[in-house]
Regions:
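Alpha-helical scaffold segments in soluble metabolic enzymes
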Residues: 141
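C-terminal motif of bacterial Sec signal peptides marking the signal peptidase cleavage site
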Residues: 18-21
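Positively charged n-region of N-terminal signal peptides that target proteins for export
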Residues: 1-4
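Bacterial N-terminal signal peptides
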Residues: 8-16
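N-terminal secretory/targeting leader peptides
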Residues: 23-129, 138, 147-149, 153-348
Length: 348
């Protein structure tokens, strides 16, 4: 009830903002008479995401908002609602598509499933490979397909949180067989479900905002998330055993409503695009800087963190190889695209 009431209040606030969100009021927002953007109008950009205060996505979005306002002389104001205030990631993307809000960030691929190709298990092994994949011509092509399917514009594609790890409340996971019989929470993403099923686990789809309580009440035995998410959402309070398997990363598309985007003057689109690029770079930098500290918080709380050897990681990799062929068969990517991604990774 509390969650529904909060969402209701936020939606009332948003309803009052919608009229301003596409405003082309020609009054100047800069002091004095030297505003280079005078006459271009004023705009409000409402953006939602699911992460809490302190998470790299939260911090980088606040930086983006400040940069856009400063560089447009206050003509574009970005209002960021984090921590799932505007709903689940799927609900937020739906709001972007219909124009209730102007943007959202998050690993939401229901409307653009081919972006899932970048979430194949053990696809990349380091930051350079992740950056190469997300900045590739293949990524640009897939984003263009997603834009056409959703009527949105993807103004940045960065990392959603870093390498993803396994955890559960029953026993240590040191080898693939240790996952057999565990009920693992997922966000409904096909490649995560496929991966856990290949390892012998069952899966249950639970919204991110509800995950802490689901783990606490044993609705799910375990979950997978990056260290920064585990630390930020305090999952370590309700999970005992963690395995640093680094099995997957997620793209983090920044969706913007296409109609609103095209209504902006070209000068503002250019500035917002540049600020989004800076935001993505800052986000990835924060992720890399915060992983070890976040992991240490988990250790200090008293949880067991197992770090597999290279040989043990190879066993996990071998166990999920079939996921690649399964994704090709389901049309997430073609065999040629799979080879293109493998070539990109091998070249870095």
């Amino acid at each position: 009830m509390k969650k529904l009431l909060t969402l209701f209040v936020v939606m009332i606030v948003l309803a009052g903002m919608v009229f301003a969100a596409g405003s082309s009021d020609s009054s100047s927002s800069a002091a004095g008479g030297d505003d280079e953007f005078a006459g271009l109008g004023n705009y409000t950009m409402i953006v939602g995401h699911a992460q809490p205060n302190g998470n790299p996505r939260y911090v980088s979005m606040e930086s983006f908002a400040a940069d856009v306002e400063a560089k447009t002389n206050g003509h574009v104001k970005v209002q960021v609602f984090g921590n799932g205030q505007l709903g689940t990631e799927k609900e937020m993307l739906e709001q972007v598509v219909i124009g209730t809000i102007q943007g959202m960030r998050g690993g939401q691929f229901d409307f653009s499933p081919r972006l899932l190709m970048f979430t194949l298990p053990f696809l990349a092994q380091n930051r350079a490979q992740v950056t190469a994949l997300l900045s590739s011509d293949l990524a640009k092509k897939v984003c263009a397909e997603a834009e056409e399917a959703t009527g949105t514009v993807i103004i940045n594609l960065c990392d959603a949180g870093g390498w993803r790890q396994f955890s559960n409340g029953k026993h240590p996971i040191t080898k693939p067989d240790d996952l057999k019989g565990l009920k693992m929470r997922t966000n409904g993403m096909k490649t995560i479900d496929m991966t856990f099923q290949a390892l012998g686990a069952t899966t249950t789809s639970i919204p991110y905002a509800d995950l802490y309580m689901a783990l606490k009440t044993s609705v799910a035995d375990g979950q997978e998330n990056p260290w920064v998410n585990v630390e930020g959402m305090k999952f370590y309070e309700v999970q005992k055993y963690f395995t640093e398997v680094n099995y997957q990363f997620h793209p983090d598309p920044f969706y913007v409503n296409g109609t609103w985007w095209n209504s902006l003057p070209e000068e503002f689109r250019t500035i917002i695009s540049e600020c989004a690029t800076d935001m993505g770079n800052y986000n990835d930098q924060l992720i890399d800087e915060n992983q070890e500290a976040a992991k240490q918080v988990v250790k200090d709380y008293g949880c067991q963190v197992y770090e597999p050897t290279a040989e043990e990681i190879k066993a996990f990799q071998d166990a999920v190889l079939g996921v690649y062929d399964q994704c090709v068969k389901e049309g997430i990517l073609t065999q040629d695209e799979l080879q293109e991604m493998l070539d990109i990774v091998a070249s870095v």
